């Protein structure tokens, strides 16, 4: 989500560089009217955001999750970015591009004069190095590019011209570019770790609107305004930003009400949202979004390796109670992995409902018996995941199955989810929009080629689905892609690969004096 931060040439430009809220977009400020509060500092020039998750690393090529978008959008620039709702892709460091007739060669023209934080100019060599670094490290968003980008195919043709050769046509090629951050190769020379990764995990080598000042893995980070950013500052800009980790929900809400922070995440329980909606000093924005809540199941670990067990667990979840009683109807039931307001999601998909009789029937069909307690992991600081875990526990208890609830932090769970042996039995999270294409959900979650990324932590493998998803990635006809994604969705749901609960609206709590909020569901 975004805030206007500055204007240029009389035309207001939306900056996605400033603050990331609720994991659904980022804030950039321009022309905000400042009423000094504690959250803004004494002179109204500091913005503080509070969220439940810790920051695992400051290296933009090592991380790829909702929390990390805060730093990726503020400290770094990209070739292209998404703006507004519905999201539209816009030129950023790249001013234009051309693509060859076979759609394998993409040539980008860079804007001149963009600077890194140390004063070096952003050039094609930096873009080339950044892609090579991302692919070599094999972390973060590298899973998006590895299937189609050969490191040898990235070429700096001229100071401001970079060529990207892909190995096969990829329908979402341009939409994939916003997660790709450009780093300064000169700053990383000689720094500890491969490609300076040890150093960059706690420092900054970007060209974004803000320069890192301080980082604490458990506490958050602060940054100062980069006065030489290519998008010239005007008006009354924010000089300092802080992203503060506050695990406890009640503590975040209290901090917002007291004015200690200016905004907080949107993963709040309904009772806390209602409290904030009644507060005369707080505005809670709500917007249609694309963010699916899902309970992951380890499809390759007994007893989850039996489809009938997975179906039984899917039938044992009380969706109606969770959505209409706990969340008071503020979200919309989503029967499959693709958000129901995005193309590729089958309109007639029914999915699973709460039905203990059907759950019992599925358990009788299972060849693998549940002979141990099952573990489910909600996320520390995300109260909705606690509620969902309790509903799983209550439903399975009626089937004679014991469930242990083991709460852990997002960095711990997403780290475990990358390894098949350490992946949880079940864990609960949201899949947000990193790019506006079905591939962001079903492709990254259920293609076996993605195994090893946290999004693919169901460890699901179905050759038919793999084939459908591969074809959907490599053809340009949206109508044909839509059919392939719909077919893949039906199979994945029939296989009960995970438990899909809802597609959400974005509820963004801000102090009343925060003006000009523009929401974008990407990130």
Where do the protein language model's features map onto the residues?
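N-terminal secretory signal peptides
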Residues: 1-17
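Detector for C-terminal structural segments
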Residues: 25-29, 34, 216, 220, ...
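N-terminal lobe/hinge region of extracytoplasmic solute-binding protein
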Residues: 50-101, 132, 205-207
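Gly/Pro-rich hinge or "lid" segments in bacterial periplasmic/extracellular proteins
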Residues: 83-88, 178-236, 240, 248, ...
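Aromatic- and charge-enriched surface segment that lines or borders ligand/interaction sites
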Residues: 95-140, 157, 163-165, 255, ...
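Surface-exposed binding/hinge segments that line
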Residues: 109, 143-189, 214
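Alpha-helical secondary-structure segments
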Residues: 123-132, 159-165, 208-209, 237-240, ...
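Ligand-site clamp/hinge motif
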Residues: 198, 228-274, 402
């Amino acid at each position: 989500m975004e805030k206007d931060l500055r204007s240029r040439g009389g035309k207001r430009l939306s900056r996605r560089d400033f603050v990331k809220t609720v994991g659904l977009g980022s804030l950039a400020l321009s022309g905000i009217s400042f009423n000094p509060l504690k959250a803004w500092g004494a002179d109204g020039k500091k913005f503080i955001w509070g969220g439940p998750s810790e920051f695992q690393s400051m290296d933009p090529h090592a991380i790829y999750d909702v929390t990390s978008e805060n730093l990726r959008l503020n400290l770094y620039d990209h070739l292209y970015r998404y703006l507004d709702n519905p999201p539209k892709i816009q030129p950023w460091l790249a001013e234009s591009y051309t693509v060859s007739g076979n759609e394998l060669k993409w040539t980008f023209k860079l804007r001149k004069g963009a600077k890194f934080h140390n004063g070096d100019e952003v050039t094609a060599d930096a873009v080339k190095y950044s892609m090579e670094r991302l692919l070599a490290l094999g972390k973060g968003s590298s899973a998006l590019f590895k299937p189609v980008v050969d490191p040898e195919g990235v070429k700096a043709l001229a100071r401001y011209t970079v060529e990207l050769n892909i190995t096969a046509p990829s329908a979402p090629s341009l939409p994939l570019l916003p997660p790709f951050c450009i780093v300064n190769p000169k700053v990383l020379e000689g720094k500890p770790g491969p490609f300076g990764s040890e150093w960059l995990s706690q420092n900054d080598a970007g060209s974004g609107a803000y320069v890192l000042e301080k980082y604490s893995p458990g506490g958050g980070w602060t940054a100062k305004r980069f006065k030489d950013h290519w998008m010239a500052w005007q008006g009354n800009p924010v000089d300092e930003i802080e992203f503060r980790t506050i695990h406890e929900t009640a503590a975040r809400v209290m901090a917002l009400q007291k004015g200690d922070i200016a905004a907080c995440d949107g993963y709040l329980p309904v009772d806390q949202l209602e409290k904030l909606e009644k507060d005369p000093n707080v505005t809670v924005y709500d917007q249609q979004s694309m963010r699916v809540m899902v309970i992951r199941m380890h499809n390759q670990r007994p007893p989850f390796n039996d489809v009938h067990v997975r179906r039984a667990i899917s039938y044992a979840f009380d969706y109606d109670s969770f959505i209409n009683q706990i969340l008071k109807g503020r979200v919309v039931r989503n029967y499959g992995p693709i958000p129901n307001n995005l193309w590729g999601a089958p309109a007639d998909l029914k999915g699973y409902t709460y039905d203990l009789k059907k759950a019992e029937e599925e358990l009788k069909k299972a060849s693998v018996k549940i002979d141990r307690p099952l573990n489910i992991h909600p996320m520390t600081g995300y109260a909705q995941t606690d509620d969902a875990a309790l509903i799983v526990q209550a439903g399975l208890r009626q089937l004679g199955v014991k469930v242990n609830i083991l709460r852990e932090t997002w960095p711990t769970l997403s780290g475990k989810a990358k390894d098949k042996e350490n992946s949880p039995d079940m864990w609960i999270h949201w899949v947000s929009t990193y790019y506006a294409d079905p591939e962001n959900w079903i492709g990254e979650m259920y293609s076996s080629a993605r195994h090893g990324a946290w999004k693919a932590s169901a460890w699901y493998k179905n050759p038919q689905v793999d084939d459908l998803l591969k074809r959907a990635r490599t053809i340009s006809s949206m109508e044909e892609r839509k059919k392939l994604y719909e077919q893949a969705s039906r199979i994945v749901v029939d296989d009960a690969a995970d438990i899909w609960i809802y597609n959400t609206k974005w509820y963004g709590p801000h102090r009343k004096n925060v003006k000009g909020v523009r929401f974008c569901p990407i990130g």
